[in-house]
C-alpha cells in the first residue's frame, strides 16, 4: 500500500517500522528529525546515498513527555512536549544531541497537560521569538489560558504571553515565507453534527479571538455559551479557509522551495488525519490551499490521497492503513509525509521532463 499522487509525481517509502511517526523537521543539510510521542523521543534519519530512502537512523533525544513540535534555529533543535520547550545543542553531521536538553520555558507555561496534547512550535522569521500552539483540555467549555491559545515567547523561552485565543485545538502552525504572516490550522468542536463546526485555517493576529467556546465562523453563537460572553462573540474572527468538519487538520506547510510548479510556490499544504466520529468519514489526505498575493483564496483541492481502504463517502467507519500527520520539505524539495497507524514516512517527488 502507498499513497496516491497525481501522474506528474512519484511516491516512495522514505522510512518505515517507526515507533510513532508524527511530526517532522528538516535541517538545511538534509537531516530529518521525527517526533515520536508515544516513545518519548526524537529520531534522526539520514539519506546518505541520495536514493530517497533513509539508510541511517539514530535516537537524537529521549526521555521526553509526548514530544511533538520541532524547529531548528542556529545550532539548536527546539522540541515542544507537554512540559514545555526544550533546546538541544546540535551541529550538522551529528547523529545525536551534543548535550542534555534544557527546558527554556518556565514550569506551567502550557497549562495543565490533559486533553489535546500536541504542542507545536514555529520560530519567527527574525529569529527573535517562537510561537507554540496549545489545544484545549476538552471538547467545549470555558478554560483558563493558555489552553486553546497560541502563545508567543522570546527565543530564550522567557516573556511568554497569549498571542491569539479562542482556538479550540490549533495544531499546524507556520509563517508564510513571503509575508511573514503566522497561520494555524484548527480542529474545531464536536457534538453539533457532521456539518458543524468546520475545521479551518486562519491568519493569526496579535490579540485576536477566534470563537471557541462562545461562537464559530464569526459571530455564530454556540448554544449554552454565547450569552456568557457576548463581547467575545462579536469579536470572533472569520477563518480564511473552511475545511470539511471533522477532517482533523494537522501539519501546515508552505510550498516555497519544493518540487512543485511555479504557480504553487505561494501555496500551502495541509495534512488531514481524518475523522473519528463522523457518520460519513472525512479527511485522510493532503490538500493544497492556493494563495494569491500572499493570501489564501479560500478553497482547497486534493493532492495526496489513498490512505483509505474503503470507498470515500460511504456511511461506515473508515478503514485506513495510514493517517497523514506531519510534513516537511526535504533538502531536494521533495515532500515528506509522516503517517501514523502504519508509522512510516513517505516521500513525494516530481517526475522529470
Please state what every model-predicted region is.
Residues 27, 35, 80-82, 88, ...:
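Residue-level marker for isolated small/hydroxyl-bearing positions within beta-strands
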Residues 42-75:
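Blade-loop segments of beta-propeller domains
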Amino acid at each position: 500500500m502507498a499513497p496516491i499522487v497525481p501522474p506528474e509525481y512519484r511516491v516512495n517509502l522514505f522510512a518505515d517500522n517507526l515507533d510513532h511517526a508524527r511530526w517532522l523537521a528538516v535541517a538545511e543539510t538534509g537531516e530529518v528529525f521525527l517526533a515520536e510521542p508515544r516513545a518519548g523521543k526524537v529520531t534522526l534519519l539520514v539519506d546518505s546515498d541520495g536514493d530517497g530512502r533513509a539508510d541511517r537512523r539514530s535516537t537524537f533525544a529521549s526521555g521526553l513527555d509526548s514530544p511533538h513540535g520541532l524547529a531548528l534555529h542556529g545550532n539548536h533543535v527546539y522540541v515542544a512536549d507537554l512540559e514545555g520547550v526544550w533546546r538541544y545543542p546540535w551541529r550538522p553531521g551529528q547523529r545525536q544531541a551534543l548535550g542534555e536538553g534544557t527546558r527554556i520555558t518556565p514550569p506551567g507555561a502550557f497549562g495543565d497537560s490533559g486533553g489535546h496534547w500536541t504542542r507545536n512550535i514555529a520560530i519567527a522569521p527574525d529569529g527573535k521569538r517562537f510561537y507554540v500552539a496549545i489545544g484545549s483540555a476538552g471538547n467545549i467549555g470555558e478554560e483558563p489560558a493558555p489552553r486553546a491559545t497560541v502563545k508567543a515567547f522570546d527565543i530564550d523561552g522567557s516573556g511568554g504571553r497569549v498571542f491569539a485565543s479562542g482556538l479550540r485545538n490549533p495544531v499546524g502552525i507556520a509563517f508564510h515565507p513571503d509575508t511573514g504572516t503566522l497561520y494555524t490550522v484548527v480542529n474545531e468542536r464536536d457534538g453539533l453534527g457532521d456539518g458543524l463546526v468546520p475545521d479551518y485555517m486562519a491568519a493569526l493576529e496579535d490579540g485576536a479571538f477566534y470563537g471557541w467556546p462562545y461562537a464559530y465562523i464569526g459571530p455564530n453563537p454556540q448554544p449554552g455559551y454565547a450569552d456568557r460572553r457576548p463581547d467575545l462573540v462579536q469579536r470572533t474572527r472569520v477563518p480564511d479557509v473552511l475545511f470539511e468538519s471533522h477532517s482533523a487538520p494537522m501539519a501546515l506547510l508552505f510550498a516555497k522551495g519544493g518540487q512543485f510548479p511555479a504557480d504553487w510556490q505561494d501555496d500551502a499544504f495541509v495534512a488531514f488525519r481524518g475523522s473519528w466520529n463522523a457518520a460519513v468519514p472525512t479527511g485522510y489526505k493532503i490538500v493544497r490551499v492556493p494563495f494569491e498575493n500572499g493570501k489564501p483564496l479560500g478553497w482547497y483541492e486534493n493532492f495526496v490521497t489513498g490512505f483509505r481502504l474503503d470507498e470515500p463517502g460511504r456511511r461506515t467507519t473508515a478503514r485506513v492503513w495510514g493517517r497523514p500527520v506531519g510534513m516537511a520539505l526535504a533538502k531536494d524539495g521533495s515532500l515528506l509525509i509522516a503517517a501514523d497507524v502504519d508509522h512510516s514516512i513517505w516521500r513525494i517527488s516530481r517526475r522529470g521532463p
